[in-house]
Amino acid sequence: MGQKINPHGFRLGITTDWKSRWYADKQYADYIKEDVAIRKLLATGLERAGIADVEIERTRDRVRVDIHTARPGIVIGRRGTEADRIRADLEKLTKKQVQLNILEVKNPESRAQLVAQGVAEQLSNRVAFRRAMRKAIQSAMRQPNVKGIRVQCSGRLGGAEMSRSEFYREGRVPLHTLRADIDYGLYEAKTTFGRIGVKVWIYKGDIVGGKRELAAAAPAGADRPRRERPSGTRPRRSGASGTTATSTDAGRAATEEAPATDAAATAPAAGQPETTES
């Protein structure tokens, strides 16, 4: 299942969070339709901006849209004209006040959506698909937080008559591990032979810190209070069976003979006077 399903949807509530955060009762379908329209509006008008992610939050009378982009200057525009235009379009679409936040992506080589978009742009410019895939993998693996990457291209690769899929992988990409931090991106390249789909999976290590992970990492019985042993000597055990020294006949006989031998050792020998200290 982990090989086929969308990694973000597979890990929702475990290691990933929802991209749209709001509550609705009867307006649920309308809000879903609005979210799709918002994302489509931002995707069609800002292809060159390198948008990695769009997050949407709603309140009763306001909509907050966070745009994560690798080129914030294109989204903002000269003196903020482009940002004002986007905000006006969103307010016209949602009929509510829109708060637009433009956030810069620090490491675009480690974001799966931006890597997929970069490979797709090279395919549209007639670059060989294998060369584009290997170049993207090499640039991503240079980042310190990237542990593994997988890039897949599907379609009429190289103008072939029959479509096929090819992928390259470097490092570890555990798609079925729920605690794994997997970033996933999808983009379509428009070529003269048709569309070529590009998928990218980037593994950035495991996420440990949730309640389930902490409970699993803690040793068994670690939360129990430690019982203190009472002061005094602990009875010695004899043999491998774990019995005490007086629980068997041989042990009892040995303990009875021990005081007699001690008394004989302390008594003076015959014919020798006792010496006392003055």
Curated annotation (Swiss-Prot):
Listed Low complexity bias regions: 238-278
An example Gene Ontology biological process: translation
Single GO MF annotation: mRNA binding
Entries under InterPro entries matching the protein: KH_dom, KH_dom-like_a/b, KH_dom_type_2, KH_sf_prok-type, Ribosomal_S3_C_sf, Ribosomal_uS3_bac-typ, Ribosomal_uS3_C, Ribosomal_uS3_CS
Organism: Mycolicibacterium gilvum (strain PYR-GCK)
Originating gene: rpsC
Assembly with partners or alone: Part of the 30S ribosomal subunit. Forms a tight complex with proteins S10 and S14.
Protein name per the record: Small ribosomal subunit protein uS3
Signal peptide residue numbers: none
Record keywords, A-Z: Ribonucleoprotein, Ribosomal protein, RNA-binding, rRNA-binding
UniProt keyword Zinc present: no
Function: Binds the lower part of the 30S subunit head. Binds mRNA in the 70S ribosome, positioning it for translation.
Any GO CC annotation of this UniProt entry: cytosolic small ribosomal subunit
SUPFAM superfamilies: Prokaryotic type KH domain (KH-domain type II), Ribosomal protein S3 C-terminal domain
PANTHER family documented for this protein: 30S/40S RIBOSOMAL PROTEIN S3, SMALL RIBOSOMAL SUBUNIT PROTEIN US3C
PROSITE patterns: KH_TYPE_2, RIBOSOMAL_S3
Domain KH type-2 as annotated: residue spans: 38-106
Region annotated Disordered, chain positions: 215-278
Record has Ribonucleoprotein as a keyword: yes
Family membership noted in the UniProt record: Belongs to the universal ribosomal protein uS3 family.
